[in-house]
Amino acid sequence: MAERHIVRDVALCPVEIAEQIMVMPAVNRRWTAKEVRELIDANPLATPRYELVDGALLVTPAPRLVHQEAVAVMLLLLRGYLEIEPVGHALTSPSDVELEEEFLSQPDVFVMPLAEWRRVHRERIVRRLSVAVEVLSPSSAGHDRVRKRPGYQRNVSEYWIVDLDARLIERWRPSDDRPEILTQSMEWFPPGAAAPFRLDVAGYFHKVLDLPGE
């Protein structure tokens, strides 16, 4: 039997097992954002990610290294753009993004408006985003696409889902019933900017996935 670790009401599997299953919600229990923050504070060295969606606690294991590479490259590109067009600030998780009372997420990469960054840069809880980016992992794909998406669509003007296996980005906006599928290039034109953020989607995946010489 696989070893299991209990944290309050949540059973955690070792990373090598958890990577093969979906994100695990706590059962028979509704959580609050305050309780989830306390759980994070009580486990500062834990590798799982804790998120709250519609009162359910989601626990995600540590991601693969290629996931981290995708996050790092996206952050670098967004920050480069925002240095030229200072209309926001880009960061990565772990960060507490509380968009609703029962929606506390840790998007892989996110952009907050400049006014929000000025408000929270010495605090902890982010409440407004311009863009949320999730990079799919085997353990989180279903929840990034289905469970968390409505919360992002209600509160964020752009939600990007990066699919490393398919080499595409799904772009969701608040009124969308289906995503825009982007495989070659994409643009994001935030309010107040003089020029859009332009992403060579194919080039991005080449940089993330293809080792030198391939």
Segments predicted by a language model, with ranges:
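Gly/Pro/Ser/Thr-rich low-complexity, intrinsically disordered segments predominantly at protein N-termini
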Residues: 2-214
